[in-house]
């Protein structure tokens, strides 16, 4: 199986580079980023951006914004918060980049309100949401719902593609965390096919910006490998929502070669650091795993002010560690061809 996947990957790369030798470059500002909470207000995030404005070891920020807050009615968008973040980042004394992560679920919700635009809750979209193990998540395996998520990504991509401080877009994690029995029509293959549609559409909308698909789990290693192939073909970035030393997600297993070809020199790679791993590991242990094993280029560190002891919190643990300039991979990934620094 490994030999077959490696051969298939080699052929894919050959075809890809033959077809896209003159492809335009992609913005490339790898490094350590601070990641804000979905529940942080715009004003709070703007204050926090000022606090890290002079920190040379921090390359930028990731903001997490709910789909509901970005699309106020079908096809009507409110990007005022994104505009404000970019303006604040440009005003800082050191260069800072922006990654926007679109949130299409709520892990702890008891109500469907405020997650996706209200029109999606109609029968046209089968209610738009489905119950997950702990909350609600958009029905992303269904083409009608994915069509609307693609429309949102496309609108953001087209608006900010030309902004040099806009590093790109990120998704929520690929797993939907559904309980069994699965909803009618759901399968790993169906979900993977819709993610591939998203990857292709976003690259068309923003050819020089990054698109971070949070490939943590999708239920099938072969489907996950197919997603890596689609990211290769479109010059997208694989990612994930956690960095847990010695405990890889399915996506991390695939890109490090546990099931076949090793993608670490070929794909742009990223992952977030959440409070779960900070309870068990120090920032240095997490970074060592990310650098030596996962070989990621972008790390999004949660601005943790509530979990763990002082060594795991932002002001007293994470930020002091980042000031030591811990190593991170910066090489332009093979699939990108040209990186714009």
Locations of regions flagged by a protein language model:
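Aromatic-lined substrate-binding rim segments of carbohydrate-active enzymes
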Residues: 48-125, 187-201
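Substrate-binding cleft of secreted/luminal carbohydrate-active enzymes
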Residues: 99, 103, 236-341
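An active-site-proximal structural segment forming one wall of the substrate-binding cleft
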Residues: 85-92, 96, 129-170, 194, ...
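Boundary/entry segment of secreted carbohydrate-active catalytic domains
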Residues: 23-59, 64-66
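Bacterial N-terminal signal peptides
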Residues: 6-17
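Aromatic- and acid-rich polysaccharide-binding/catalytic face
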Residues: 58, 63, 68, 207-217, ...
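Sec/Tat signal peptide C-region and signal peptidase I cleavage site
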Residues: 17-23
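Aromatic-lined carbohydrate-recognition surfaces of secreted/lumenal glycan-active proteins
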Residues: 32-39, 165-176, 196-223, 241-243
């Amino acid at each position: 199986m490994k030999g077959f996947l490696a051969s298939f990957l080699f052929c894919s790369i050959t075809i890809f580079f033959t077809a896209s030798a003159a492809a335009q470059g992609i913005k490339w500002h790898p490094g350590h980023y601070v990641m804000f909470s979905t529940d942080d207000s715009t004003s709070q995030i703007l204050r926090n951006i000022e606090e890290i404005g002079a920190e040379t070891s921090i390359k930028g920020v990731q903001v997490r914004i709910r789909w509901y807050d970005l699309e106020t009615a079908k096809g009507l968008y409110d990007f005022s918060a994104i505009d404000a973040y970019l303006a604040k980042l440009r005003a800082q004394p050191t260069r800072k980049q922006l990654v926007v992560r679109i949130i299409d679920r709520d892990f702890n919700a008891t109500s469907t309100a405020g997650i996706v635009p209200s029109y999606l809750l109609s029968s046209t979209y089968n209610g738009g949401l489905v119950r997950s193990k702990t909350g609600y998540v958009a029905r992303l395996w269904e083409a009608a719902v994915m069509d609307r998520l693609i429309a949102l990504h496309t609108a953001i991509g087209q608006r900010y593609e030309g902004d040099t401080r806009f590093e790109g877009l990120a998704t929520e994690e690929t797993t939907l965390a559904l309980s069994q029995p699965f909803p009618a029509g759901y399968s790993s293959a169906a979900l993977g096919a819709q993610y591939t549609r998203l990857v292709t559409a976003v690259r068309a909308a923003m050819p020089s910006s990054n698109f971070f698909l949070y490939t943590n789990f999708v239920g099938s290693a072969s489907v996950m490998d197919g997603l890596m192939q689609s990211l290769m073909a479109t010059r997208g970035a694989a990612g994930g929502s956690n960095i847990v030393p010695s405990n890889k997600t399915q996506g991390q297993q695939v890109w490090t070669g546990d099931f076949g070809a090793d993608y670490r020199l070929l794909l742009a790679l990223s992952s977030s650091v959440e409070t779960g791993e900070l309870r068990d590991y120090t920032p240095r242990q997490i970074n060592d795993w990310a650098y030596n094993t996962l070989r990621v280029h972008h790390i999004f560190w949660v601005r943790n002010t509530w979990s763990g002891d002082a060594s795991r919190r932002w002001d007293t643990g994470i930020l002091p560690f980042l000031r030591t300039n811990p190593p991170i991979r910066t090489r332009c990934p093979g699939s990108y061809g040209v990186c714009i620094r």
